[in-house]
Design a protein with these regions (language model features):
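Eukaryote-specific intrinsically disordered, low-complexity regulatory regions enriched
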Residues: 1-148
Length: 148
């Protein structure tokens, strides 16, 4: 559990002490801590989601970069089939992006750039990414529809 505490307390929430943009060294440190805490991946993902939800607007995009870095490193290290982070992030991805889009308007293009890279590299399926791109264009987020 100490690797999880290191990730959440020391790495993730210490981002608030730095002025964006976040250095490559800091991002690498956060990513390594997340991968080290893979046994607690659900908590790692929840920590990132909570950070994005609660941080100041100027830290929204760095929060996305943390998410991106963790997913890419996990896929690189363990392979696409064994990556646990991307499937977990996708569970609440609409809500996470609703918070991300509360960033300064200049930062929205950075979010779209990450989404386009995810689409190009098949990090998430198109049916996950397309609604997020639509949200960037000002369309309302999709709602869950239940058939009775």
């Amino acid at each position: 559990v100490s690797c999880l505490n290191t990730f959440i307390l020391k790495c993730l929430f210490s981002l608030n002490e730095y002025k964006p943009p976040i250095s490559k060294a800091k991002m690498t440190n956060i990513t390594k801590s997340a991968i080290k805490a893979i046994k607690y991946y659900k908590h790692v993902v929840q920590g990132v989601e909570k950070f994005v939800q609660k941080c100041k607007p100027e830290y929204k995009v760095p929060g996305l970069y943390v998410m991106d870095s963790i997913v890419r490193q996990s896929r690189h290290q363990f392979g696409q089939d064994k990556d646990v982070f991307a499937p977990r992030f996708s569970k609440n991805i609409i809500g996470t992006f609703q918070h991300l889009y509360r960033c300064p308007s200049d930062d929205k293009s950075k979010i779209v750039r990450v989404l386009n890279l995810w689409q190009k590299n098949a990090v998430f399926k198109s049916d996950i990414i397309q609604p997020l791109l639509d949200m960037a264009a000002g369309l309302p987020p999709p709602t869950c529809q239940f058939s009775i």
